[in-house]
Swiss-Prot record:
Major subcellular location class: plastid
Functional note: Possible role in chlorophyll and/or carotenoid binding.
SUPFAM superfamilies, per database record: Chlorophyll a-b binding protein
Alphabetical UniProt keywords: Chlorophyll, Chloroplast, Chromophore, Plastid
Family: Belongs to the ELIP/psbS family.
One term under GO cellular component: chloroplast
The protein's name in its UniProt record: Uncharacterized protein Ycf17
Localisation per UniProt entry: Plastid, Chloroplast
An example molecular function term from Gene Ontology annotations: chlorophyll binding
Top-level taxonomic group: Eukaryota
Organism of derivation: Porphyra purpurea (Red seaweed)
Length: 48
């Protein structure tokens, strides 16, 4: 079985992909906050 092959359900490869996407999303939020100087909740209109 390939490590990066996608299988449906709670498998090791699915959890690996989930972790990768979570890290990308987290870094995107940090980048947006650094560039704009405002938090994500403020930019989305939840903290107005």
């Amino acid at each position: 079985m390939k490590k990066n092959f996608w299988f449906w359900g709670f498998t090791d490869s699915a959890e690996t992909w989930n972790g990768r996407f979570a890290m990308i999303g987290f870094m995107a939020v940090i980048f947006i906050e650094l560039v704009t100087g405002k938090g994500l909740l403020y930019l989305s209109g939840l903290m107005n």
